Curated annotation (Swiss-Prot):
Belongs to the oligoribonuclease family. Residues 8-171 form the Exonuclease domain. The gene is orn. Homodimer. It comes from Escherichia coli (strain K12). This is Oligoribonuclease.
Amino acid sequence: MSANENNLIWIDLEMTGLDPERDRIIEIATLVTDANLNILAEGPTIAVHQSDEQLALMDDWNVRTHTASGLVERVKASTMGDREAELATLEFLKQWVPAGKSPICGNSIGQDRRFLFKYMPELEAYFHYRYLDVSTLKELARRWKPEILDGFTKQGTHQAMDDIRESVAELAYYREHFIKL
């Protein structure tokens, strides 16, 4: 293991909703790949404690999804708050990628970055300002080569580490079938 500026940091958050002014992070996971999308290491998957009052603000979709996955119970049982989760994630990332080198990688990653900016600003600042957003390729494929879209299916567990692994696999799929490298 050594920090390499070409490695990519992949991240996914599960939140109580989509508005960082009202909602909170309830799960964070990261993994690191090399430039060829080979997974080098998986970071900690952390349920971030939130109060019962905060959890009660979730809409029906979030309650159903995060209860079915067991995340609500893990959040209630967790002793890690935003700052502890942020520090544990940074400790992992520093082993693999120097600060400011990796774009933030994932699916619809701009949404996650909004929450990081508000609740985990030190972690948000660890990333390069650029984004590697797999959903951009999906949108381009939908418009320019829709016949390839059915070739990749997500499980959609809405568990952070599962979602990241799927994002890496989805980018590899688009690299082969859309970009054709």
